[in-house]
Amino acid sequence: NAILDEAGWSKNVKGIRMNSAGEPLRFDIMTTAGNRTRELVQQVLQSQWKAAGIDIRIKNEPARIFFGETVIKRKFDAMAMFAWISAPESVPRTTLHSDDIPTTENNWAGQNYTGYRNPEMNALLEVIETELDRDKREVLWHKLQNIYATDLPALPLYFRANAFILPKWLSGLTPTGHQFPTTLWVEDWAATN
């Protein structure tokens, strides 16, 4: 609240923050209509932001419109809420590199839906894709994570837990931490009695 007060956003009689021009601090949060989990998250966020004096409007669309038009063509004014998954070491080029911002010129290709641009991140993503030395990759990933945490191009809400069911006779298999099973470290697998 103090940061908003200092920035000139004071609460009116209804508890909504207004700037000096009398404009409310208001934005939309969008997701797919009918997705109960996301709709509940929207309601919680709306309630929490209201306590801070921010007017959040919930605006949802059918999935075919939300993903087929709104998200890919970047037609949301503030926040679009959806989930995505990736492997633990997938380089997030399509979501973070400025070359992957969907535009009319590239026929809406890429998944950098927020329009995030950072030349340092671009260079880092390009190096990570080709670096094979494990120690060097670790340093690069730490740099990437620090830039991400500073710039916050997307706001992760939570990580989904995925069940990983293994047969009792199989040993040495390490769950991947994401929904896709993998044959990584297959040399460690063994059939046991």
Regions picked out by a protein language model, each given a short descriptive name:
Residues 1, 37-47, 64-193:
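Detector for C-terminal structural segments
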Residues 1-13, 33-40:
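Structural transition elements
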Residues 8-14, 50-66:
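Short, well-structured beta-strand/strand-turn elements
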Residues 10-24:
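Short helix/loop segment immediately N-terminal to the Walker
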Residues 24-34, 56-59, 78-81:
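Short, well-ordered beta-strand elements
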Residues 25, 52-54, 153:
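Envelope-exposed proteins and targeting segments
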